[in-house]
């Protein structure tokens, strides 16, 4: 019997606030790529922009409420629990430790390309 290797994506952002475009993009990503789970990861301390106006715990609570009835989308608090800046590379490494060597995908919201030069270890 073969072992199932889950297909996983990370969707990071400040989610300040979470809105329908975030949700629609995550659902479309999951469906189009036949993913098992999309980890929606609110940035605690985004290093490439100013701090969000809403606190991390409140943004996480809003995200959890928004995802409550959406299978395959998970509110992931790993960046909020981590001290220091919220580097996507660190989050991907953490997901790799959790899942092993299965598929990894990174989805970034559409405006990330504008700040790409400021993103750690590109």
Predicted regions and their residues:
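Nucleotidyltransferase catalytic core that binds NTPs
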Residues: 1-114
């Amino acid at each position: 019997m073969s072992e199932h290797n889950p297909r996983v994506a990370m969707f990071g952002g400040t989610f300040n606030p979470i809105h329908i475009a975030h949700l629609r993009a995550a659902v479309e990503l999951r469906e189009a790529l036949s993913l098992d789970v999309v980890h929606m990861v609110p940035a605690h301390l985004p290093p490439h922009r100013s701090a969000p106006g809403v606190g991390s715990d409140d943004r996480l609570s809003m995200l959890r409420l928004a995802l409550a009835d959406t299978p395959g989308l998970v509110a992931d608090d790993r960046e909020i629990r981590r001290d220091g800046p919220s580097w996507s590379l660190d989050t991907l490494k953490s997901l790799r430790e959790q899942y092993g060597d299965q598929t990894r995908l990174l989805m970034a919201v559409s405006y990330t390309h504008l700040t790409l030069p400021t993103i750690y270890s590109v």
